């Protein structure tokens, strides 16, 4: 297995697919990286030369991926919570952040139902 940005990428898959195993690199970014490195998307990872791997690593080093990207995302969320913005409040309360309805659905974000007992009338 080749290691790129601290991640073992699968040897038997095409390079364009293997690069998506790195957090922060999707299909489009992987295609751009390979075009810049001059490597065919159809090449398997096991068939890459050390020179090609080195060029790919150099390009990925310029992109924010893995730990740096995760840290930036968490700091952005923390900043929203500290300044008291609406989005920050939604993050703090564990509710949907992007305007979705939460009366009936939003179970993924809210977690399992907590049944509240009825008051006697």
Swiss-Prot record:
Region (Disordered): 91-121
Pfam families: Ribosomal_S13
Keyword terms: Ribonucleoprotein, Ribosomal protein, RNA-binding, rRNA-binding, tRNA-binding
Biased composition (Basic residues): 106-121
Keyword Calcium: no
PROSITE patterns cross-referenced by the UniProt entry: RIBOSOMAL_S13_1, RIBOSOMAL_S13_2
GO BP of this protein: translation
GO CC term (a single one): cytosol
GO MF, one example: rRNA binding
Function noted in UniProt: Located at the top of the head of the 30S subunit, it contacts several helices of the 16S rRNA. In the 70S ribosome it contacts the 23S rRNA (bridge B1a) and protein L5 of the 50S subunit (bridge B1b), connecting the 2 subunits; these bridges are implicated in subunit movement. Contacts the tRNAs in the A and P-sites.
Subunit architecture: Part of the 30S ribosomal subunit. Forms a loose heterodimer with protein S19. Forms two bridges to the 50S subunit in the 70S ribosome.
Family per record: Belongs to the universal ribosomal protein uS13 family.
Protein name per its UniProtKB record: Small ribosomal subunit protein uS13
Source organism per UniProt: Bacillus cytotoxicus (strain DSM 22905 / CIP 110041 / 391-98 / NVH 391-98)
């Amino acid at each position: 297995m080749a290691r790129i940005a601290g991640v073992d990428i699968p040897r038997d898959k095409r390079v364009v697919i293997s690069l998506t195993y790195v957090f922060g690199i999707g299909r489009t970014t992987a295609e751009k990286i390979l075009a810049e490195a001059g490597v065919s998307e159809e090449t398997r990872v096991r068939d890459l030369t050390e020179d090609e791997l080195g060029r790919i690593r150099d390009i990925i080093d310029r992109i924010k991926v893995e730990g740096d990207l995760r840290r930036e995302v968490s700091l952005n969320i923390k900043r929203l919570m500290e300044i008291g913005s609406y989005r920050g409040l939604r993050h703090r309360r564990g509710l949907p952040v992007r305007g979705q309805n939460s009366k009936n659905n939003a179970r993924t974000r809210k977690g399992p139902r907590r049944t509240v007992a009825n008051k006697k009338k």
